[in-house]
Amino acid sequence: MENMNLGADVKPVNYTINVRGQLLDLSHPLVMGIMNVTPDSFFAGSRVQTEEAIRQRAHEIVAEGAKIIDVGACSTRPDSDPVGAEEEMNRLAFALPIIREAEPEAIISIDTFHASIARRTVEEFGADIINDVEEGKDPEMFPTVAELGTPYILMSTAANLHDMLINFSREVQELRALGQKDIILDPGFGFGKGAVDGNYTLLSVMERLQVMELPLLVGISRKRMIHQLLGITTDESLNGTTVLNTIALMKGANILRVHDVRPAVEAVKIVEAMRQNAEQ
């Protein structure tokens, strides 16, 4: 029988980031749990708006093994209604004290593309990470995160790996020149890659992003590239999500951003066990 090369396991970049003066080791993959304080994010299971629901979701994310809670107050799904920065900030101002009280040790990431919101959530509410899904489109974002000194997640909207590497190289250089130390790269699955094909092409070569020598975050949870390919609904997309998260881990992901924390934590444990017990 002919040998089939399914691709070697690629270990994540050995990297630490500074969170609240503590070094967070990303050489062993971590899980980031999604909390959307919105009425219209694409997966209903992540939406919470009342005080009790926010508290319960925070407890659930941490209890299932996530180190990071990613809080979004503006839906980025393609057909969502636009939300102004003021309303986005009002939602976050309500939710963040509840989350911090419920889980004081959790690392809180803010999913926003507004520099003004990045500043306020860090300075007024003690947010730990800024997660920017618009690749620094706000001209004040890079200077703001560099001044704040918080880790920054830079998500690509490029359609292919070639353009992504060119853009990332330029953007990282700009951030470094401003003094930004901790940068995490997100290939941006579901953003500008097409519904299915472009996303799978990118996933197949994702390990090549390690040339940037920066940690990689993958947010692939329950996205259209799963349910459109399989002919199922978003609610039925957990199995596909777990498969893709496992592939992402084997291609060097440092952080998995997910709606369903426990399956992702289990995927991390299984891949890590395989690495630890691999034949030398």
Model-predicted regions and their roles:
Residues 26-37, 60-72:
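N-terminal glycine-rich anion-binding loops that anchor highly charged ligand groups
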Residues 3-9, 19-20, 26, 42-60, ...:
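Active-site-adjacent loop and "lid" segments of alpha/beta metabolic enzymes
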